[in-house]
Structure formats: structure tokens, C-alpha cells
Amino acid sequence: MRPYVILNAAMTLDGKIATATGSSEISGEEDLRRVHELRRECDAIMVGINTVLADDPRLTVHRVDAAPGDNPVRVVVDSMARTPPHFRVLNDEAPTVIGVSESAPPERVAELRKRAEVVVAGTRRVDLHLLLERLHGMGIERLMLEGGSTLNYSMLTGGLVDEVRVCIAPMIVGGRDARTLVDGEGIDEMADAIRLELKRSYTLGEDLIVEYTVKG
């Protein structure tokens, strides 16, 4: 068993989630509120270590009305235990789970255990299937994925995403080195593409929101 997973992201019309320099201010204010409402509805929010290192995010509910107990559990996929101990994801605003691999340096793991629940899953890299199974065992039934390109790819190709919700902003940035919604090795044949079914689409301010379910 694993949690129900909703991949949520904001991208430009040309599919970029950040520029080549890392600038990622894409969503309008209305969409940011939508994101925080979704956070409030989920038991956990998952990001990868690259997102943590780039943004030092809080991963809490703070753009809509929320009680302290409304903050989801923060989950970081961090194979080598690189999360800096002073980063905000380890503050006391909400519980945090760090998923590491067996290859993570023991001294880093020990330091993280002082501030978070550490789950060892996988030998060299975090085994996402095993991590999600462990999270479900901890009572997490609904998880919001706010991953970067690499984590999104791994979760989607692993069959671990149930819904995809995307804010498409009326911007075009281009750039061969700019991050796309999903990267990774990619799929060779279009016939093997991950198929989605559109459930809803609507506008929020200038942004277009599309919501899909992932076909089995």
C-alpha cells in the first residue's frame, strides 16, 4: 500500500518550471493560494533534495487560513543525506521525514535524526516504492508531490502518481538548459508515453489550471 499521490506544479506555456538561472516565480497569487489549500488537504508534501538546496523552502501552509495542525508532514527524498541541518525544512513548524539510502554517510544521517524522522529505503538511491510504503505505514494516505524535473520523472515512470495538477502561466522563457516539468532519461517510443485523462480545467487570474488522472 502507498499514499494517493498528486503531482502539483507550475510551468510556463513552453513547459519550463524554472529558467536556466533557477528563477521560478511562475504562479500568480490566485494559484499560490490554490497550492496552499491543496497542501492543507494533504497529509504530506514531498520534494527532492535539489529543490531543498535551491530554495530552502518551508513547505508549510501559510498563504491561506490554517491552524498549526494543518501543516502536512514534510518529506525530502535525499539519497545521500545532504539536507543542511539549519535549513527551514527542519524547523519545528511541522514534522519532517527524510528518505535516505543505505549509502548515506552515517554521520550525516545521525545529524538529521536529531531534527527529523529518517527512513532508510534503498541501497544507493532512495527506493521510492519502499519509501511510499513506509510513509503509508506512518498514516500518510494523501501526498502532494512538489518535485523538480528529476523526482517528477522518477515518480511518474515508477507508476507512483495518481493525479497531475498543473498551473500553466502565460509566459514563454525557452532555454535548452531551463528545467522542464519532467526530464530524466525520457521515453523512447511515443506509444509508451504515460497517458493522462483530463478531469478539469479552469482559469485562475491569468493562469490556466489543468487537472488530470494518470491512466493505469
UniProtKB/Swiss-Prot annotation:
Pathway: Cofactor biosynthesis; riboflavin biosynthesis. Pfam families: RibD_C (PF01872). The keyword Phosphoprotein does not apply. One of its GO terms (biological process) is riboflavin biosynthetic process. Its EC number is 1.1.1.302. Catalyzes an early step in riboflavin biosynthesis, the NADPH-dependent reduction of the ribose side chain of 2,5-diamino-6-ribosylamino-4(3H)-pyrimidinone 5'-phosphate, yielding 2,5-diamino-6-ribitylamino-4(3H)-pyrimidinone 5'-phosphate. Homodimer. This is 2,5-diamino-6-ribosylamino-4(3H)-pyrimidinone 5'-phosphate reductase.
